[in-house]
């Protein structure tokens, strides 16, 4: 069962709130490098699914390995930049204030930009499934 419209509206509202400019000089939390899980729990409007939200603080030019998720991913860029590649599509550069939805099962990868990446990502995860599934790099064949 896929999450319904109420789940998507709630996620969109949450991401929209992140885009509201704040006062100058407001201190911003700086988590340790990596992905810090900040929220996780069941979604009442989508039985059989739970939401995981992460605060991403990725160092400059760090690779984002090939992977996919069993549920949808919603990524909102707060600072820095990232290059995302979805299998079968070209590179996409995302900058502060931009967001992307990645469909379930879509193999994707990328790298943080030259100044690193700060972002918030939310994943709608079917119960009993892992958050992320690693996908081995495709070997380059001679002549390609």
PLM regions and their residue ranges:
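A short beta-loop-beta micro-motif enriched in histidine and acidic residues
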Residues: 47-49, 61-74
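Short acidic-glycine-tyrosine-enriched beta hairpin
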Residues: 58, 88-105
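Glycine- and acidic-residue-biased ligand/ion/polar-headgroup-sensing regions
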Residues: 70-88
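Ligand-binding loop in jelly-roll beta-barrel domains
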Residues: 104-130
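Histidine-centered metal-chelating micro-motifs
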Residues: 63-65, 83, 100-110
């Amino acid at each position: 069962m896929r999450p319904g419209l109420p789940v998507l509206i709630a996620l969109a509202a949450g991401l929209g709130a992140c885009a509201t400019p704040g006062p100058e000089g407001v201190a911003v939390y700086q988590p340790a490098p990596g992905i810090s899980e900040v929220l996780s729990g069941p979604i009442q409007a989508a039985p059989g699914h739970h939401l995981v939200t992460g605060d991403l603080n990725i160092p400059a030019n760090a690779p984002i390995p090939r992977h996919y998720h069993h549920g949808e991913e919603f990524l909102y860029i707060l600072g820095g930049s990232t290059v995302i590649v979805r299998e079968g599509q070209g590179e996409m550069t995302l900058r502060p204030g931009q967001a992307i939805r990645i469909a379930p099962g879509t193999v994707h990868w990328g790298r943080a930009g030259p100044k690193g990446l700060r972002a918030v990502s939310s994943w709608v995860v079917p119960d009993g499934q892992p958050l992320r599934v690693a996908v081995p790099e495709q070997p380059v064949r001679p002549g390609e």
